[in-house]
């Protein structure tokens, strides 16, 4: 019988298994990755299940093995230098400024900053940003993967095309289809703004294009040709649902190419949440599926900052989501559909792309697995059926869409995966970004917690805080600045280099126990243009 790592790898990395099932396991280079006793429940995308209580645990010489690998959790007195810290924090940062025409920016967006800090290896988060070329507006989104990065990668590549096609008028769709039929060059519909590390899958591009083409052909057939206004909310919902349907269909049909066949199955059996913003002038739409968030930074008349939430988490803390799930399934499942704050006791987000194990019937799952490649058929995770699985689907990718009309006081938008929101309160996020963008920082009073502090000690604390503040504003990217605070903040609300160094020095097998992947996009709005829209009305 193959070793547990051979059964699970590479569909899901073994480090991921220890998080999913809360068991100790070997990673592919024979190291003891992690143990459930050290992993906070909030860090688990899936909760442990008894069926796997012994599956991943080494059966022999367990005590001697853990002693021999003690180095993995032994604290080491090693600190990164400030340049080394900056190198890590800035490795994935990206900035885009909207170009000016005749010395003026006529867009409601000045530009955006984005960045990522991995905790998983490889990182499971993705990000995307693109300008719509055949319609107006800009699309920006963050995608949080689980059970691997296959689904988040696919969604980050494909979703914006589905949205752009959904927004196109009938005449443009016909023009694109005629160009494909005649072999002419296609009209570009998106201009991507990507970091060099943000890649596209060349091997799957033809498959993805064919699915997208089928979608716009159906839109052409459904449209009578009459000129009608496009409903952005409806377009976003249709795009999300259609992409998820295509992900499911591609996995069911398979592909003659063995690599693509395995790829589409990996995409379907893993999962991803998505939070996407579409900005067109003063019209801001946010489509959210899962537990990433969109937060608007509002500057009040007195100069202070307030946070306006533009998305809702789709998890057990959302009463409306709990009610929705209970209404969609028989009363006999009222106590089992959500257990321990997880869908069927396993999955934390209640909406997501992929995750076909929570959408397909049991018969369909068995048929696809049995006819699939050996890696899939021999994989215990894919063959595992969730408990109390009676009336699928239990999971949907349909987004909740929020509309907001921008005002001059709306200065920026923060899109971020839950790795940020788990470490920082929304008000702190908005305050830190607002102070960074304006260059004004309001110091918080130093709290000494009831201890007696001499004047000299207080002077030392103030001097230390001033020194740290001077180094923080070296960031040229608002998302980097926010990540620096999320990882390195101390009790005074300032960045502690020692703490930041320790957090960034954690080995791969330990980093995920302390934090999640963090992906952030900060969109800065053009208050002058937004104000001009308001004056015209």
Swiss-Prot record:
Mitochondrial enzyme that catalyzes the dephosphorylation and concomitant reactivation of the alpha subunit of the E1 component of the pyruvate dehydrogenase complex (PDC), thereby stimulating the conversion of pyruvate into acetyl-CoA. Residues 1-71 form a transit peptide. The keyword Magnesium applies. It is found in: Mitochondrion. Mn(2+) 2 binds at residues 144, 418, 516. The keyword Manganese applies. Heterodimer of a catalytic (PDP1) and a regulatory (PDPR) subunit. This is [Pyruvate dehydrogenase [acetyl-transferring]]-phosphatase 1, mitochondrial. The lineage of its organism: Eukaryota, Metazoa, Chordata, Craniata, Vertebrata. Keywords: Acetylation, Calcium, Hydrolase, Magnesium, Manganese, Metal-binding, Mitochondrion, Protein phosphatase, Transit peptide. It comes from the Eukaryota. Belongs to the PP2C family. It holds the Pfam family PP2C.
